[in-house]
Every structure is written in C-alpha cells, then in structure tokens.
Amino acid sequence: MTTLNILYEDPHILVCVKPHGIATQSKSIRYPDMVSLIKNHLAKASGTSGKSGAQKSCSSRTPGSTEPYLAVIHRLDQPVSGILVFAKTPAAAKDLNKQLQNQGFGKYYRALVTNAPASPKGTLENYMVKDARSNTSHICSAKENGAKIARLHYDTVSDNNWLFTAPSFRPYGNVKDANSQTSDSPEKPGVFQGTELEIHLDTGRHHQIRVQLASIGCPIVGDTKYNPALADTKNWQTIRLCAYKLDFKHPVTHKVMHFQLEADPL
C-alpha cells in the first residue's frame, strides 16, 4: 500500500511527492496512480466514500457525484520521482495552468548521469518529436512533422550537495560506465558512480531531460529507454531522475510557494 507524502495542503491545492514507479494519472485500474491515491485521501478527509478508487482518470467532478475534485496541473514520467502540485478547485486549476503556460513555474530536477558533460554548465536546445507507438521521443530537425522546441539548462552539482546519496548510487566522481557493477555486491557504496546535474526546464516535452542528456553522451543511470548500457535490460531499474524543487505562486493568496527535497524519495 502506497502512503501519500504530502508536503502541503489547504482548501485550494495539494503538494505531494510522487515516488518512482507510480504514474501521475493512468487509465488502468490495476495499479494505483497519484490521482486515485489523492482522491481517496480527499474522500476520507471529507467523510465521503465517493468513487475515487474506481474512476481514476477523471480530473473534474461529475454532476451529482460525491467524487472529490482534483485537477492534474503537471506530470512526471512514471519511472521519475519528485514534487507535484494538484488543484482542489476549478479556480485554482485555472490559475495554476495559466502560470504553467506563462512559465510561472520553477521546475528543477536532479539527474545522476553516467558521464560528465563536456562543459560543466550549459544550455541544451533541440527539436524533439514523440513516437506514440513506442512511447519514446527523439531529437529531430525543425522540419520534421510534429517537431517541438525543447530547451533546458544544466549545472554540475558540487561535492557534498548531492540529492542521490543512497549507498547503491552515491556519486564518487566521473567514470566511463556508471552502470557497471562489481561481482561481489551491486549494493555496495560506489558501485554506481557518475556526475549529478541540476536541471531547469524551459519547456516540458515528453521524456525531454532523458532524451537531451542522452544525446550529448550523458544518459541517466537506470534509464532503460535511453541509456545504451541498459538497452537489453528487462528487469526494473530505478532511474536516477527526480523533480526535487518546485516554485509557483499560490493561486489564491499569490504568495510564492517553494518546495524542495533533500534526498531522492526511494
């Protein structure tokens, strides 16, 4: 049973941490997603049973229904962990969506990559296109059908300021293959070595960070879609990518809200 990690809640918004492996919102009723978990939480808090556990993909109240209102403002890929904000009223959803469209959100990520980038700090700007059939994206030319601009800024994280500090993937420096494992124990400190990057998104394309970092030879540790070292891996891997910091203005009070994680929520 997944327990919600709620960072902040009031009558208008709810801010929580999405763990690795749980979808933000899914059409499947087989596994829980963040929307169903939060709706169950809201239903229990209000003392109503509602339909929060069964109707997971609905983000608006059905007339005559007791299901709590919840609007998805932004999403994280299912393998990725991090901070999400949800709206509990239509007015809050409208304001937050407007902020998101006008780049009013500060979305910051941490990624543990296999190789250090050529420059410790920089901007990546590419055109990307999504392949719905394979649920992947790739770098493309501006003329390709469906191409969209993708831009991010990255900076190498200094020593002792890491987010990824669990023993199995503690970064001890740059190595050629951060996915290599020792023969005696894959869980010992230092097995996964790499470079930790802080990333600030200007755009929010499908798999953007994963694709753009892989395109410069810096795939993310644990990324079975875009890390060549894991291309034949069939077992579940925990991707070392976390939306660790989020800034926005409260939709009602307009106060600047700041949330930050100190460690990756495994």
Residues covered by each model-derived region:
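RNA pseudouridine synthases
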Residues: 1-266
